[in-house]
Design a protein with these regions (language model features):
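Non-catalytic substrate/cofactor recognition surfaces at enzyme active-site rims
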Residues: 1-390
């Protein structure tokens, strides 16, 4: 069962509350995937809120109340689904092409693949369509009203195929992928309409038949941060954070983060790892389709790596933003230089910067720099997913 919500992301605590409720309904943990569309114009959720965007916020209780309500709403949705009358369907799969994404980190990888899984009734007509694309849902820019961005318009187009068609979107490896144009609802609607039309035109004819059961796995991987816990290094880290906090040009959230991390260095109250959920579904029939759902804002290089070793998108569906989003998940290629996705600022490469400041971490992820060095984030991710796909 895959549940998708139009929110930026689920934090660890909220995800675990929802997962616990679903398990209590009789669903095996490995059979449940919770995904966020990652719209940047969705409702505020707790956990990553304080102290970075809540300087003058007085209704934090309302934020928590909404999160509690959302958790129950999603659990009720699962319960309703489980109690509903079953329908006989067949599954078929195909991959189509879209072209409005760009690699914002300047790498060569650009997401074009759109995996599409269709459930058809006994009459051959589509009943449900699951589809994905790897581009940040930021085409609409910053809006003051709720806006699900391009996935919503794509869903509208697909569901216009005919009565009774349900469409669902899951976000691909979009950590370093943005729409090539952003800034208005009109832009977002245009991209969504184009994506939806592409999928709608494709589902008129069945793709490759998917058979068999599903072998599901749910695991957690521990990813190392690049932190040397010695008195001398922590003193240097504290000094670097103090300089950032005092610099007149430091943006508000980065200044607040620096203040907090300076205190953490003094108190030695910081994590040295990030815990990330991973899921793999493997269809056990002859079709050979496998689906990967990673937590975090996974960058496209991981998808490129695993597709190349598993028969491309025709055999491997790779998605991110599943279950929990504790950070961007960069590759060694990104960690070798500064950048937002890497969580490294050029003026202070030894401390957390960019996205790692936003996500409230003490340092950026560890990069393996030699064959004898400890495994870094990329090696840990590759080993875990490879094992699960085997």
């Amino acid at each position: 069962m895959i549940v998708t919500a139009d929110v930026l992301a689920f934090g660890a605590a909220l995800h675990q509350v929802i997962r616990s409720k679903v398990i209590q309904l009789g669903v095996a943990s490995a059979d449940f995937v919770l995904t966020a569309t990652h719209t940047h114009n969705g409702p505020v959720l707790p956990e990553k809120l304080d102290p970075y965007i809540s300087y003058n916020l007085t209704n934090t209780a309302q934020v928590q109340q909404y999160a509690d309500q959302l958790a129950q709403t999603l659990a009720d949705l699962v319960a309703t689904t489980l109690a509903s009358t079953r329908s006989t369907v067949t599954l078929d799969y195909q991959v189509v092409d879209e072209d409005f994404s760009r690699n914002r980190a300047g790498l060569s990888y650009v997401e074009r693949d759109v995996p599409v899984l269709v459930a058809r009734g006994t009459d051959g007509k589509p009943r449900a369509v699951l589809f994905s694309y790897g581009a940040h849902p930021v085409a609409a820019g910053s809006q003051t009203l709720f806006d699900p961005d391009y996935p919503a318009e794509a869903i509208k187009e697909i569901e216009a195929f005919g009565p009774g068609v349900f469409a669902q979107f899951i976000l691909g490896p979009a950590g370093d992928q943005n729409p090539h144009t952003t800034g208005s609802v009109a832009v977002s609607d245009s991209f969504g309409s184009d994506l939806g039309t592409t999928v709608r035109d494709a589902i008129g004819q069945p793709g490759r038949t998917i058979t068999g059961g599903i072998a599901s796995q749910y695991e957690r991987v521990t990813l190392p941060l690049d932190i040397t816990v010695t008195s001398a290094n922590l003193a240097a880290v504290k000094a670097a954070y103090d300089r950032r906090a005092a610099a007149p040009g430091t943006i508000g959230y980065a200044r607040r983060h620096a203040q907090r991390m300076s205190a953490a260095a003094t108190n030695r109250s910081f994590a040295t790892t990030v815990d990330l959920p991973l899921q793999v579904w493997k269809f056990t029939g002859t079709s050979g389709l496998k689906m990967v759902f990673t937590g975090g804002e996974i960058v496209s290089g991981y998808a490129v790596y695993f597709r190349a070793r598993n028969g491309g998108s025709n055999n491997l569906w790779f998605s991110g933003y599943a279950n929990e989003v504790p950070a961007y998940i960069p590759s060694n290629e990104l960690l070798a230089r500064d950048g937002y996705e890497a969580g490294i600022d050029s003026d202070s490469p030894g401390i957390a910067g960019g996205s790692m400041s936003v996500y409230n971490h003490f340092g950026h992820f560890l990069r393996k720099t030699s064959s004898t060095a400890p495994d870094g984030v990329e090696e840990k991710m590759v080993a875990a997913i490879t094992r699960m796909l085997a």
